[in-house]
Structure formats: structure tokens, C-alpha cells
A protein has these predicted regions:
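Short, surface-exposed beta-strand-loop junctions and turns on beta-sheet-rich folds
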Residues: 18, 59-61, 92
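Terminal "cap-and-tail" regions of soluble proteins that handle hydrophobic small molecules
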Residues: 80-138
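Generic short beta-strand segments
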Residues: 8, 54-60
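Short, solvent-exposed coil/turn segments at beta-strand boundaries
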Residues: 1, 48-50, 76-83
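Short, surface-exposed coil-to-beta transition loops
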Residues: 37-39, 54, 67-74
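A solvent-exposed, acidic/Ser-Thr-rich amphipathic alpha-helical stretch
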Residues: 2-51
């Protein structure tokens, strides 16, 4: 997946805001840690250097082992045949309800838990990058 991105690419979703090699690292980490992962995509549209797609990822969240079905809308901008800008949209509260269970149901809508999740995800990605020199910035 990482090879689809331009070296100067930017990625944003409700959890991450990344650039360059860190996008590669995120996909590597998520796919490596995902249990029972499957992906279905639909409504792919391409016009010039812009594309969009809807997709649904199904997996067991590695921290809680709870099943997650996450519908995502993606938009892409391409440069030199590679993704230079990628934006994913999904309902973070719905994701937290599935992935975290009761705590996600009760607190997933709060800025407190959303920010805690973002911090946890950033720390996990930083640890992954530290263990994989190929993703460290030059």
C-alpha cells in the first residue's frame, strides 16, 4: 500500500494526520496487526488526477479483540501517478463503540476519549516506526 504514495504525500483521517514515510508505516502497522482483516470497496470514481472511493474494513481490533466494521469514504489527489493527498472520513464514535465496547459506547463521543485514542494511536505508530528504520525520516 505504501508504494502507492508520493514521497511528499499527506494523509488525514479522524485519528491520524501524517506525511511521507509515516503513511507507509501506518498502513504496514495496521495491516500487520489487523486480525481477520477484509476490505470491500465500491463507488470508485476517477477524474483526471482526483479519485474517490467508499470502502468497508472488517477486522478484530488488536487491543480488545472486538469485531469492527468500519465504512470509510476516501478522496485522493494524484501527482506523477502516485497519491499526493489522501483524506479518509468515517464516524469515529461508531468505530469506538465497536472497537472499545462499553467505554466507547459511554465516552466515545467525548473529546476526552477521542483525544486519548489519537494519542494512543500516535504512540503506537511512533513505537512501530522506532522498530522499523525504513520509516524513519532521513
Amino acid at each position: 500500500m505504501g508504494n502507492c504514495y508520493h514521497p511528499d504525500a499527506k494523509f488525514k483521517d479522524p485519528v491520524y494526520e501524517l506525511e511521507g514515510k509515516h503513511i507507509h508505516a501506518m498502513w504496514h502497522m495496521l495491516l500487520e496487526r489487523g486480525k481477520e482483516f477484509s476490505l470491500v470497496y465500491s463507488e470508485v470514481e476517477v477524474f483526471d488526477n482526483v479519485a474517490s472511493a467508499n470502502w468497508e474494513a472488517s477486522y478484530k481490533f488488536n487491543v480488545t479483540n472486538l469485531p469492527v466494521v468500519n465504512p470509510v469514504s476516501s478522496s485522493f489527489i494524484f501527482e506523477d501517478g502516485l497519491i499526493i493527498n489522501h483524506h479518509d472520513s468515517f464516524d469515529l464514535y461508531e468505530w469506538q463503540k465497536q472497537a472499545l465496547g462499553f467505554p466507547g459506547i459511554m465516552l466515545g463521543w467525548t473529546p476526552f476519549l477521542k483525544n486519548k485514542l489519537r494519542k494512543y494511536a500516535a504512540n503506537a505508530l511512533n513505537a512501530f516506526i522506532a522498530a522499523h528504520p525504513e520509516y524513519q525520516n532521513d
